[in-house]
Design a protein with these regions (language model features):
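Bacterial Sec-dependent N-terminal signal peptides
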Residues: 1-21
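Alpha/beta-hydrolase superfamily serine-hydrolase fold, recognizing
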Residues: 15-307
Length: 307
């Protein structure tokens, strides 16, 4: 009886934060299948020496633990690492949604990490940014374990995760975006950004952000304009921004601010690349035939930057 009560209490603790489960691969498939009847949910091909370790705790505060899934080749050492951030409008989604993409990129000679971070029902901006930057430090601190070269780190995100990836990459070692409670010998600096259909500016002529952005940014633009500005990668892009790849769908609003950021990168002679997948929907990376192109564009870019 005592064991049962302890088990139940642990379950209550584990669910003491809000979870929005509305954004899933299957729900996205159901929305798209009528317009795109040829699509198939993407499946991964596992390399013979590839290893997956799930639910590694990278940070814990009181009863709340944050996890990551690690994917790496046990025969190869000092691989470039790819930190992966799922989408879901900053309020839904989970790290499992990055597993197929992680496995595919791992099979090409990289170590990949799918990150759990706190979403807007649980924590407002910039807490999720702190979480991913803490995960980067954790990966660097454990570089030998994960077969990682700590000086070759890319951050990749999809949709809202793409927005976060761009913000993380454009705020390298900016103390405003560092969690002072997290103790590490490593920095959160990254050397490359892959933004997959994520906006670069919240308030922009091309942007159409509304309720979900307001929930994450703790208010509408009129209520909290500073957060809307500070959370925009375009606001931070400068001569220190790392090489950047933009992979986009055919929907323009999901790359709001991209062309302005490219102008800054070009002005500073920073390598950047744009790949648009024609006639594709948002969330194209979940499905074939588009996952294959996503992997191809990502790995060719990473090879150019790191190898």
């Amino acid at each position: 009886m005592l064991f049962f009560l302890w088990f139940v209490s642990q379950g209550i603790i584990a669910q003491s934060y809000s979870v929005d489960t509305s954004y899933t691969v299957m729900s996205t498939y159901d929305k798209l299948i009528k317009k795109y009847p040829f699509i198939k949910i993407a499946q991964a091909t596992k390399g013979v020496n590839d290893v997956k370790i799930e639910n590694i705790v990278y940070y814990k505060e009181k009863d709340r633990a944050l996890h990551l899934d690690a994917f790496f080749n046990k025969k190869q050492k000092n691989n470039p690492a790819v930190i992966m951030i799922h989408g879901g409008g900053w309020r839904s989604g989970n790290k499992n949604q990055m597993q197929v993409l992680a496995k595919e990129i791992t099979s090409k000679g990289y170590s990949c990490f799918a990150i759990e971070y706190r979403l807007s029902p649980e924590a407002k901006y910039p807490q999720g940014i702190y979480d991913v930057k803490n995960a980067i430090k954790f990966v660097k601190d454990n570089a030998k374990r994960f077969h990682v070269d700590p000086d070759k780190i890319a951050v990749l995100g999809c949709s809202s995760g793409g927005q976060m990836a761009a913000l993380i990459g454009t705020t390298n070692e900016d103390l405003i975006f560092e969690d002072t409670k997290y103790k590490s010998k490593s920095s959160s600096r990254v050397q490359a950004i892959i933004d997959i259909d994520g906006i670069l500016a919240f308030k922009h002529p091309e942007s159409a952000e509304g309720e979900m952005a307001s929930l994450w940014l703790d208010g509408t633009y009129e209520q909290n304009p500073e957060n809307w500005k500070q959370a925009s990668a375009l606001h931070h892009a400068n001569e220190n921004t790392p090489p950047t790849l933009f992979i986009n769908s055919s929907f323009e609003r999901f790359h709001a601010g991209r062309d302005d950021m490219i102008a800054i990168l070009n002005q500073n002679k920073i390598y950047n690349q744009v790949e648009t997948i024609p006639y594709s929907p948002h969330s194209f990376w979940f499905f074939q035939p588009w996952l294959e192109k996503t992997v191809e564009y990502s790995t060719k870019f990473l090879e150019r930057v790191f190898k």
